[in-house]
Regions:
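Alpha-helical segment that forms one wall of the substrate-binding/catalytic cleft
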Residues: 43, 47-103, 114-121
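Short, functionally critical alpha-helical segments immediately adjacent to catalytic or ligand/cofactor-binding
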Residues: 11-27, 36, 67, 89-99
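A short acidic/glycine-rich loop-to-helix N-cap element
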Residues: 105-109
Length: 127
């Protein structure tokens, strides 16, 4: 796992763990821990040509690097367009709903589940 990796001032490990719990119960109920689709990977390869093979979605650490790059690109675009800060909510909703996920009402229920798990992860990190 990418320990203590930060993006936009946010520690990502608690968010990765929260998303994994919500998306797949940490891999228990899914072959793909973060539910990364081929479309997600195709989009990454459009931004960063031919870096990510489709099989990365089956590898936890490679998936985290892919998510990092996805967020690095699209969360920055969000902040630039809106002038608003990048938060865990922004990252989770972009991951769930694509480049414009933060603007989609359909990503709110997912965010609320992630937020609940994220609070647990952040509390655990304090101990």
């Amino acid at each position: 796992m990418m320990e203590q990796i930060m993006l936009f001032g946010l520690y990502l490990t608690p968010l990765f763990n929260a998303i994994a719990k919500v998306e797949s119960d940490c891999g228990v109920t899914s072959k793909n821990i973060y539910q990364i689709s081929d479309i997600y990977i195709d989009d990454l390869n459009r931004i960063y040509p031919h870096i990510y093979p489709k099989l990365i979605k089956f590898d936890k650490v490679a998936s985290e690097y892919a998510m990092y790059d996805y967020w690095r690109f699209y969360a920055y675009q969000y902040a630039r367009k809106t002038g608003k800060p990048i938060t865990y909510e922004v990252l989770a909703r972009i991951h769930n709903g694509g480049p414009n996920g933060m603007f989609k009402a359909t990503t709110l229920p997912h965010w609320h589940k992630v937020e609940k798990e994220l609070k647990k992860e952040l509390e655990r990190a304090k101990q």
